[in-house]
């Protein structure tokens, strides 16, 4: 072995395991002890909210000492105070009520409970109206009628509707019925009172429909039947009604000159197509007018059926008054000539004959 390797081997010292551990882990962590690791395992302490941090730093951005010393308390929802209830009312409200059989009147305890509830609601309304008395409305001076049971009201109204009040003999039946309906309306308006859960919804029902009383007395003569409205209308009223209603827009009307111009153009086009087969005047001069003599004799005498005549025929067919009338109208009609299909076939045949004559003339000249 060379001597250099022996020297280097003697210089290297063996490393103990304790030395490796101490070099890898710093001594300051080992000296802290187990409490240090326990504190890290625990959850973080409670953090301050933004309001608390601003409260702590208030002296930095607030100048007045009063604001610095004052503390802002959180806003709490307003709690509605319950109305005071007397001990007698508590006992009445807490006492059990008897069951009602057959929907008859309530027991005395139930009636007292309803009256006490109504008094409590009236006290609440009076107190709220007393605070707003500066507006000029004196609502607290109202005297609310006592609340009645619904079954009692129905029985009362039904009994009153059956009653017929005596009227003097000279009075007309219309006056007696009006008196009865007026009395019933006043009593029903006074008796009805709508009470809801909220104090502001308590109101007196005044919009009650008037009750129609049926007169039961045999002495009163029967009412005459009402005359029909259609018979009462006069011709003057018929003239006034269209003026009051919405006026109709006049339909579009063309002038006579425009219509005559249109009809003239249509007649010229029809004459040119059917009489001269739609040919231009130059072509007609080349072919010769004598060739159109037969076509004119066949076509000029035809009666063309317009759209207006077709619509009038449809209207006449819809009229189903009598068979004789339809037969007379059918006899009065002017007999038409050949059909449009046959007329077109003749024109096509005649044009084909002209074409053949042209070709034969060309062949003869060649």
From Swiss-Prot:
Gene Ontology cellular component list: centrosome; cytoplasm
InterPro entries referenced in this protein's UniProt entry, alphabetically: FAM110 (IPR025740), FAM110_C (IPR025741), FAM110_N (IPR025739)
Stretch list, region Disordered: 127-150, 163-182, 214-253, 313-333
Residues recorded with modification Phosphoserine: 234, 297
Source domain of life: Eukaryota
Assigned protein family: Belongs to the FAM110 family.
Name listed for the protein in its UniProt record: Protein FAM110B
Gene: Fam110b
């Amino acid at each position: 072995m060379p001597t250099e390797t022996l020297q280097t081997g003697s210089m290297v010292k063996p490393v103990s395991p304790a030395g490796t551990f101490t070099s890898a882990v710093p001594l300051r962590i080992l000296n802290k002890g187990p409490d240090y690791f326990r504190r890290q395992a625990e959850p973080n302490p409670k953090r301050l909210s933004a309001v608390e941090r601003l409260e702590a730093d208030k002296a930095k951005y607030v100048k007045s000492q009063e604001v610095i010393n004052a503390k802002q308390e959180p806003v709490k929802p307003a709690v509605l105070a319950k109305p005071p209830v007397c001990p007698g009312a508590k006992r009445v409200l807490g006492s059990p009520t008897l069951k009602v059989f057959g929907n008859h009147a309530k027991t005395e305890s139930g009636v007292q409970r309803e009256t006490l509830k109504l008094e409590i609601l009236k006290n609440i309304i009076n107190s709220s109206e007393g605070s707003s008395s500066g507006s000029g409305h004196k609502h607290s001076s109202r005297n609310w009628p006592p609340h009645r049971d619904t079954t009692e009201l129905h029985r009362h109204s039904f009994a009153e509707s059956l009653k017929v009040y005596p009227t003097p003999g000279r009075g007309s039946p219309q006056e007696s019925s009006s008196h009865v309906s007026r009395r019933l309306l006043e009593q029903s308006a006074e008796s009805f009172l709508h009470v809801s859960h909220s104090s502001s919804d308590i109101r007196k029902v005044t919009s009650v429909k008037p009750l129609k009383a049926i007169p039961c007395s045999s002495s009163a003569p029967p009412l005459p039947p009402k005359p029909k409205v259609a018979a009462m209308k006069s011709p003057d009223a018929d003239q006034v009604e269209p003026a009051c209603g919405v006026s109709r827009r006049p339909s579009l009307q063309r002038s006579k000159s425009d219509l005559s111009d249109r009809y003239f153009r249509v007649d010229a086009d029809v004459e040119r197509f059917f009489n001269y087969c739609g040919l231009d005047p130059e072509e007609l001069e080349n072919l010769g007018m004598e060739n159109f003599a037969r076509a004119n004799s066949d076509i000029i005498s035809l009666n063309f059926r317009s759209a207006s005549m077709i619509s009038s025929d449809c209207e006449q067919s819809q009229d189903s008054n009598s068979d004789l009338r339809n037969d007379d109208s059918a006899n009065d009609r002017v007999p038409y000539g050949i059909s449009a299909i046959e007329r077109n076939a003749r024109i096509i045949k005649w044009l084909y004959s002209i074409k053949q004559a042209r070709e034969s003339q060309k062949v003869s000249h060649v």
